[in-house]
């Protein structure tokens, strides 16, 4: 039997509503979970800098950022998967070769988020942290992640082929593609977290909605897709709950809290040890 020790949340489209806020109901339920001994974690493709407002609000025990390239516990780095200055320049040059000199690019570093934006991103999303404008001409920094806006799937495929040593995932809500080290995925970051913190992956409940979340949901003891998730995520998750605008996470955790005796069996089913029977109830937070 396995109990839940860590609740792990993607941000955009999952923990965040469409207006890029966390609902008071969700915050209240998460506080209750923490009081009962659950660890709280964030697993996001945002850079740490662009998630700062939510990090301050949630105070997560575990932070996975830049799509898995960074893992922090408190102020301690547990895992980093960085590109060298030379590798970063090669990636930028490849993006411009395939997509043109005017293509929009973002780069995450440990300390900042760089973007050759055409429109200030904070005018579109006020939750977005500070982005430093650069034309990338003389960019010389180590990096965690590159994102490129690519409107043509053929060109996206060409860039993926040129950067075959990278992990590439598209974000479903636009035309952006993320490139990280092959070893920098959310699921790899979870395994690194487990190794350091003494947690087993089957003791984690993870929530997500997009392509980058699929591996994470499949790895953890229970992978939960939001009602607004893309179909590929719903099809690979253990269960689907309400949407991010319907307090889906809060409703799930509230119901889970009603079944105090339910535990995860090793195969992901739920068993009620008090009654000695397998339950059809879909919620568990022992």
Show the residue positions of the predicted features.
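Mg2+-dependent phosphoryl-transfer enzymes with acidic/Ser/Thr/Gly-rich catalytic loops
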Residues: 2-6, 17, 23-24, 178-259
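Active-site neighborhood of HAD-like aspartate-dependent phosphohydrolases
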Residues: 2-7, 11-57, 259-286
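Active-site metal-binding loops of divalent metal-dependent hydrolases
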Residues: 13, 68, 209-210
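Active-site phosphate-binding/coordination module
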Residues: 19-121
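Short active-site oxyanion
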Residues: 37-41, 60-61, 144-146, 202-203, ...
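Substrate-recognition/cap helix-loop segment adjacent to the acidic, metal-dependent catalytic center
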Residues: 46-64, 150-168, 286
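A structural signal for hydrophobic residues in beta-strands of small regulatory alpha/beta folds
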Residues: 64, 79, 240-241, 270
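Conserved acidic, metal-coordinating active-site core of Asp-based
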Residues: 94, 98-207, 211-219, 228
């Amino acid at each position: 039997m396995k109990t839940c020790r860590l609740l792990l949340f993607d941000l955009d489209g999952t923990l965040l509503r469409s207006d890029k806020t966390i609902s008071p109901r969700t915050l209240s339920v998460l506080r209750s979970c923490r009081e009962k001994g659950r660890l709280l974690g964030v697993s996001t493709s945002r850079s740490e800098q662009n998630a700062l407002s939510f990090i301050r609000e949630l105070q997560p025990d575990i932070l996975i950022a830049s799509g898995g390239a960074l893992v922090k516990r408190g102020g301690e780095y547990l895992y980093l998967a960085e590109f060298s200055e030379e590798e970063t320049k090669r990636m930028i040059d490849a993006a411009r070769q395939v997509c043109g000199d005017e293509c929009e690019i973002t780069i995450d570093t440990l300390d900042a988020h760089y973007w050759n934006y055409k429109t200030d991103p904070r005018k579109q999303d006020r939750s977005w942290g500070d982005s430093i404008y650069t034309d990338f001409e003389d960019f010389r920094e180590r990096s965690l992640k590159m994102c490129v806006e690519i409107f043509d799937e053929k060109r996206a495929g060409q860039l993926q082929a040129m950067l075959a040593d990278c992990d590439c995932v598209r974000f479903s809500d636009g035309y952006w593609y993320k490139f990280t080290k092959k070893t920098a995925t959310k699921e790899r970051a979870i395994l690194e977290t487990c190794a350091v913190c003494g947690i087993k992956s089957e003791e984690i409940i993870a929530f997500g909605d997009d392509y980058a979340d699929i591996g994470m949901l499949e790895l953890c003891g229970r992978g939960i897709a939001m009602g607004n998730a893309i179909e590929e995520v719903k099809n690979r998750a253990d269960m689907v709950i309400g949407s991010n605008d319907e307090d889906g996470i809060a409703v799930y955790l509230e119901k889970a809290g009603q079944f105090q005796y339910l535990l995860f069996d090793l195969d992901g089913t739920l068993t009620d040890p008090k009654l000695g029977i397998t339950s059809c109830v879909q919620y568990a937070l022992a």
